[in-house]
Amino acid sequence: PIDTALRAEIDTLNATIYANINNGAYKAGFSSDQAVYANAFKAYFRTLEQLETRLASDGRSFLTGSHFTEADLRLFPTLYRHDPVYYIRMKLNGARILDYPHLWRWLCRVYALPGVEQSNSLVHCRQGYFGRSWNQTVPLGPLTPLSYPEAYNHPNLFKFP
């Protein structure tokens, strides 16, 4: 964007999302050291909390406001895979994205953008992360409250208390 303040905001978000979410999932999932795993796990969920707060603060639709940006694009793949794949495979079982109401609605909003649903395949993701493992067993869940990716079509699955 021409707006230098917006560009700086996107760049800052991109750096945080890459370090703690995109790469953070792999740091946690492929770590063979408990301390490295714990640090990556904590940074991942701390960043999810920060993003949840950001989306909740003023009811914004996307990370920087009312428009989809590069920061949203960077965050989407990891959050799309979190509940059905990374929760188990990457040992990121601190919470589901469904447990964060604003992130969940954001995820469903991005999934509903033209072409996004058609461009993603959880079958492919599950095969890639689980089918190539030592026993080639691919988990079937999660199945509640709905199976994935069908759940992404229901932004109101999360019920505020």
Which residues does each PLM region occupy?
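C-terminal alpha-helical interaction module
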Residues: 1-161
